[in-house]
Amino acid sequence: MERAPPDGLMNASGALAGEAAAAGGARGFSAAWTAVLAALMALLIVATVLGNALVMLAFVADSSLRTQNNFFLLNLAISDFLVGAFCIPLYVPYVLTGRWTFGRGLCKLWLVVDYLLCASSVFNIVLISYDRFLSVTRAVSYRAQQGDTRRAVRKMALVWVLAFLLYGPAILSWEYLSGGSSIPEGHCYAEFFYNWYFLITASTLEFFTPFLSVTFFNLSIYLNIQRRTRLRLDGGREAGPEPPPDAQPSPPPAPPSCWGCWPKGHGEAMPLHRYGVGEAGPGVETGEAGLGGGSGGGAAASPTSSSGSSSRGTERPRSLKRGSKPSASSASLEKRMKMVSQSITQRFRLSRDKKVAKSLAIIVSIFGLCWAPYTLLMIIRAACHGHCVPDYWYETSFWLLWANSAVNPVLYPLCHYSFRRAFTKLLCPQKLKVQPHGSLEQCWK
């Protein structure tokens, strides 16, 4: 991300314009404000480092997570972890004192790494959305490629290469191409900070294009899910009318109040969305808000994915012997039970699809919320050379951008059942051994 002079004290020519900076470069924060800001920054660092470290440790502890789509989540966690472990800590004393004290060499390294990590984080989000898009719209070919780990590694490497090429060469060579550096002593920001043409080009590649791509992929997933839902509903209606009342047997016993659930103990019920009726494909896990790639194959549930799980509802009555013809009453009972089972599955999947749609909307909204203010203010600030955007708005915008690295572990892995189980294995191993299913909720509570 573009680093501003901490107080916005640079005019168009790059000369110092404030008496405070000339006197010592201090920001002018009171002791109380300095303590509050330092505490908030430390909290952001801890949240970013721990959240993403937990994702990386999960890959070490649970080999079942090492699938192609989850590798992309690992790539995202690595970039976000380094943001919290390297980029933010070096910037904290700079923003609190208004002066860079680590030297010009470390300044260059910090800028290259910061720009690289932020861009790679964005590109990884695009890659995750694209992978989910393929898992839903091209499920057959996608499943066939799940064993090709080299393909995933190539995509991950491409993300880092593109992220470096976006800003790295410009940061390293700008002062040599322009005939000298315009950055005063005690400051650290990119030479192209006020070059509007470069920034609009870079912003298009770093934010506008990725944002539109993520929106397109997730909207396509939503429309695909809605289309398949309508097809299932239409197929259920075309199955034929119910038999007349006089041909119908007495209704089966009333099912439990929670469709698709079974007792879990202590008066609770466990949803069967991972085990029974309406089981979703790994790419969009049922009940997990559809976040992140699954640990299995990444394909969304097909219209026939629950044929095996719903077979209990379509078993023939025991009175039917092998080779005997079913009576009209038995046939109507079987047909009715099948229709009830299909109706349950359709309602369950419709509820799941709504959750998936909401989760996809959250992903796009959070990404846009964290990146749009910074990108727009950066372009406006460059156009007017820093005179039309208050400094506190600009600094708030890129702290919001950094906060995206702390939010990503929540949006993607932590909302995924297989990752939560791996985290429970790390944090609450004893509870997982005693209560392998119920311990998940208890541990996270």
UniProtKB/Swiss-Prot annotation:
One of its GO terms (cellular component) is plasma membrane. One of its GO terms (molecular function) is histamine receptor activity. Residues 61-70, 130-156, 218-359, 418-445 are cytoplasmic. Residues 289-299 have a biased composition (Gly residues). Residues 234-259, 273-336 are annotated as: Disordered. The modification Phosphoserine is found at residue 439. Residues 241-256 have a biased composition (Pro residues). Belongs to the G-protein coupled receptor 1 family. The H3 subclass of histamine receptors could mediate the histamine signals in CNS and peripheral nervous system. Signals through the inhibition of adenylate cyclase and displays high constitutive activity (spontaneous activity in the absence of agonist). This is Histamine H3 receptor. The lineage of its organism: Eukaryota, Metazoa, Chordata, Craniata, Vertebrata.
